[in-house]
Amino acid sequence: VPVAPPRRWWLPLLWLLMIVSLAAGLGLRQPQPPDEPRFVLAARAMVDSGQWLLPHRGRELYAEKPPVFMWLQAAAHQAVGSWQASFLLPSLLAALLTLWLVADLARRLGSPRHARYALAALFCTLQFALMAKRAQIDMVLVALTTASLWGLLRHLAERPNLPALWLAGIAAGVGTVTKGVGFLPLLLVLPWLGWRVYLRRRGQPVPGPHPASLLCLLPAFLLGLAVWLAPLGWALLHTPDDALRAYAHELLFKQTGTRYANAWHHRQPPWYYLQVMLTLWLPGSLLLP
């Protein structure tokens, strides 16, 4: 009769399975179009030229995405020394960080049993595994937004924790300059404030930190934005270059503002995300009522 491993080994064995599964194939394939080759070429140009502030594709500035993800790829290459082995590392490490944050939050707000279930559920989600094995910005964005939610919930739902709150703001700021939607986790404060108002009107005790503590999210968020916007602003002020101004206008206004207000591509019908949830969130979507 097979003997089950002791309960204390379940979590280490699960982590070993996840690391081996997500890292499988690392260094065995080339970047695949459409996005991976562009990011790798921009990161390679940073390493070759020593100019990391602005990503280039050939001689032209690459203004479609901020450089944060390409910085991570270039840093991974500096550590590993091989583009084929390093271009997927940021996504892999971001996936592992996301898994740890989810498990830790489930343990803090629930129990070790909840942590195991949350960890296994996220790891088994089809879209999560796909993004973890692609050199795209999305997995890094997920890690940053999860870090922001982790910090917010530790402060709001566990106990007052200003360092965690600062981390939430900084992660949201870095997420925003990584891909524009990184600020979304901060909107969690709106239903939390509404819940406090509801309890107060019913004459019930209002647990949690004082709302004034949330004011530190603003400087923390600006600090996260400054990771890239500060050196970009300095370059704009001290370098009278029309190409640099055109790059900043293209990225900050067209690629960000215009995409929000009037997207010119990736148009989808209203039910698009329902379709994504039902298919790419398998097998967890089978549990939907």
Predicted regions and their residues:
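Membrane-interface transmembrane helices that cradle and orient dolichyl/undecaprenyl
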Residues: 107-109, 148-167, 175
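Loop-to-helix entry region of an early transmembrane alpha helix in multi-pass inner-membrane enzymes
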Residues: 67, 71, 80-97, 135
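Specific aromatic-rich, kink-prone transmembrane helix
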Residues: 99-101, 130, 141-158, 171
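Transmembrane-helix motifs of polytopic, lipid-linked glycan transferases
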Residues: 89-110, 147
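Extracytosolic helix-loop segments that constitute the early lumenal/periplasmic catalytic or substrate-binding loops
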Residues: 20-23, 38-61, 68, 75
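Short acidic/glycine- and proline-prone juxtamembrane loop motifs at membrane-interface regions
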Residues: 88, 133-141, 181
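Transmembrane-lumen/periplasm boundary regions of multi-pass, lipid-linked membrane glycan transferases
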Residues: 39-45, 49, 170-174, 178, ...
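Transmembrane-helix signature of polytopic, membrane-embedded enzymes
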Residues: 11-12, 102-124
